[in-house]
């Protein structure tokens, strides 16, 4: 007779099912149930990747919507179409409320459960990086004091992650590389510091290249993919400093993307 799955196993299975169906809001709900049922135990690598993928898709859809609406708003403003601009601003505000709610949800979970229960170096860096990412997403659309606060929280989280990564993870470790990628994007996009962005990305790339021969087969694909993204951004940013380019800046891919 088959052993009945535990509630944890059932929720993980349902999260995978929701992912296949591209129902990411429900995937978030299932993975939050897993996270909240753990006590002081930490998520497995598979579970934390599922949680990350769920939230990345939910937030990613809204970030894309916000960028499209903001671009339309700028065009209508330049045409002096005030009536349309007012409608667009209202709609943008609705998307921003959704973005805030999603970020607040994962940030609460990270602070209350995931970061305190993280035991290994890679899980600490993973969750602190995640904390930095979601504060950065807030900084993308917040203004004034709220933007300043979100940017400061991003910097604090990324720096804490970086301190652990440089002492506990190899330069070729995908999580360390992903952190360097997103931290450099933060310097470039949020702090408007292209020099610091390029220095951080170049240092991470050079350190990984120097140890490429030590890479294990299981993380080779993930690491080299992120290294390529670091190089793409460096190319884009150095050309942008010479002219005003508008190509897409690359961020750390979702865990499932890195494995394809």
Curated annotation (Swiss-Prot):
It comes from the Eukaryota. CDD domains: 14-3-3_plant. GO terms for cellular component: cytoplasm. Signal peptide: none annotated. Gene3D superfamilies: 14-3-3 domain (1.20.190.20). One of its GO terms (biological process) is protein localization. Belongs to the 14-3-3 family. This is 14-3-3-like protein C.
């Amino acid at each position: 007779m088959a052993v009945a799955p535990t509630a944890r196993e059932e929720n993980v299975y349902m999260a995978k099912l929701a992912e296949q169906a591209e129902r990411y809001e429900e995937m978030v709900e299932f993975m939050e149930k897993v996270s909240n049922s753990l006590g002081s135990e930490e998520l497995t690598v598979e579970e934390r990747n599922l949680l990350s993928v769920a939230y990345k898709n939910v937030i990613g859809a809204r970030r894309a919507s916000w960028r499209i609406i903001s671009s339309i708003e700028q065009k209508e403003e330049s045409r002096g179409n005030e009536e349309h601009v007012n409608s667009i601003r209202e709609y943008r505000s609705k998307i921003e409320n959704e973005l805030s709610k999603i970020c607040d949800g994962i940030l609460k979970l990270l602070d209350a459960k995931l970061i305190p229960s993280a035991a290994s170096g890679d899980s600490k860096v993973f969750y602190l990086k995640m904390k930095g990412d979601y504060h950065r997403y807030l900084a993308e659309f917040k203004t004034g004091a709220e933007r300043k606060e979100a940017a400061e929280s991003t910097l604090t989280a990324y720096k804490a992650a970086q301190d652990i990564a440089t002492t506990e993870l190899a330069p070729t470790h995908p999580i360390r590389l992903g952190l360097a990628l997103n931290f450099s994007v933060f310097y470039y996009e949020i702090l408007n510091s292209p020099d610091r962005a390029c220095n951080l990305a170049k240092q991470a790339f050079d350190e990984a290249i120097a140890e490429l021969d030590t890479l294990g087969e299981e993380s080779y694909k993930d690491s080299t993919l992120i290294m390529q993204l670091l190089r793409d951004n460096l190319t884009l940013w150095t050309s942008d400093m010479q002219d005003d380019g508008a190509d897409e800046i690359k961020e750390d891919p979702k865990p499932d993307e890195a494995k394809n």
